[in-house]
Amino acid sequence: MSFKKVSFAAVAAVCLFLGGCTQPRTTQIELPKSALDSVNLPNEVAIDGEKFILKQKNARTAEFYLPNEKVGFKWSKLVSVTVDENADINEYQKTFVTALKSGQFGKAEYDFKSINDKEYQAYTIYYPIAGNPDFDNYEINLINVKSLNCGLRVTHYALKFLNIADRSKFHALIKQKMPIFLAQMPQVECK
């Protein structure tokens, strides 16, 4: 046997061994579908005269930050949109209230107002958590929750205040900002 025949046979054997078989195969990998894929999600939103840019997104939640702020916990204002394809609006509210009452998120004040059987608005005021640098400020969340054909959409407009802020003014601020938020929140609807 000549060197060329041996080399060809060796290369052919290695190719068959590494390839697994002589027939070409196609493998399709299906990536998990993102709940956000079912909605029209903007790249930026404007609320109360400020522009927020989409900077972070996972399968369920998109976070919009002010242009000069980084992803993470050190934001001053934040807009987020979460879509849960399987959530029931009533169960979602019950679970949220249970978590708030349990102190899971620290001390919090909250209120929920039903708009109809498919939508409600809410606010939360989270108190600073001593010793936790990520949660060492007051945080107010203005929230709209709405059942859509493609899932439950939860929109938050969050504002942080120093832990020395006069919280006696928070309820007046919520009353002032809630109509602005509801009128200007991103109109994320099913595709």
What function would you assign to each model-found segment?
Residues D48-A87:
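Secretory pathway targeting signatures of secreted, lumenal, and periplasmic proteins
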Residues R25-E63:
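N-terminal "mature-domain start" segment
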Residues W75-I115:
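Mid-chain, structured segments of secreted extracytoplasmic proteins
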Residues G151-K191:
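Surface-exposed amphipathic alpha-helical segments
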Residues Q104-K146:
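Signature of long, low-cysteine stretches enriched in small and polar/charged residues
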Residues A13-V14:
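Repetitive helical segments and hydrophobic/amphipathic motifs
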Residues L18-G20:
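C-terminal motif of bacterial Sec signal peptides marking the signal peptidase cleavage site
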Residues M1-A10:
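Bacterial N-terminal signal peptides that target proteins for export
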